[in-house]
């Protein structure tokens, strides 16, 4: 009896990875994920964008499925591969990456609001801009305190 092939390809890729023994600490190369997702290699420079987009879509679906259906966090090792984070490290990893991402986005928002040509604004728009800057500053302060608390909790050793 033959086994059923799942569609789209990322569903089959998840099944194959689990059947091959994917577990915490396992590393999977980007090339292997491309093979499992049946993403055709680019034939020329113009085709690279298609390849990257297809592969990114497939990897994102695999990561989401592994996390939500199997409680396995698959993350990039920044060396061309992906690794399944061990459960005891998952909270700290999630908090650390989340805090960094929030910080980056807060900085982008603050800069966009701060570097506005206020001399070209109406009085009403200038007041809105000043109010937004004040609120963003207040929010950044609150986030800083909460982020520190989160990091402490995530890295606290159990007694």
Regions found by a protein language model. Name each.
Residues 110-159:
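Exposed, interaction-prone assembly regions rather than primary DNA-binding/catalytic cores
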Residues 75-86:
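Minor-groove-contacting beta-hairpin "wing" of winged helix-turn-helix DNA-binding domains
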Residues 89-112:
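Short, amphipathic alpha-helical interaction segments positioned at domain boundaries
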Residues 1-25:
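Short alpha-helical segments that sit at the start of domains
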Residues 63, 67-77:
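A short, conserved structural fragment
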């Amino acid at each position: 009896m033959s086994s059923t092939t799942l569609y789209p390809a990322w569903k089959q890729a998840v099944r194959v990875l689990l059947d091959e023994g994917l577990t915490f600490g396992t590393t999977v190369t980007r090339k292997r994920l491309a093979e499992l997702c049946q993403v055709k290699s680019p034939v020329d420079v113009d085709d690279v964008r298609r390849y990257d987009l297809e592969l990114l879509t497939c990897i994102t679906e695999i990561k989401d499925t592994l996390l939500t259906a199997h409680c396995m966090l698959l993350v990039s090792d920044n060396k061309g591969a992906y690794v399944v984070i061990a459960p005891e490290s998952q909270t700290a990893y999630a908090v650390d990456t989340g805090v960094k991402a929030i910080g980056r986005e807060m900085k982008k928002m603050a800069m966009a609001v701060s570097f506005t040509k206020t001399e070209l604004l109406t009085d009403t728009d200038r007041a809105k801009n000043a109010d937004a800057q004040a609120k963003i500053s207040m929010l950044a302060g609150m986030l800083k305190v909460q982020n520190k608390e989160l990091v402490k909790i995530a890295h606290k050793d159990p007694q």
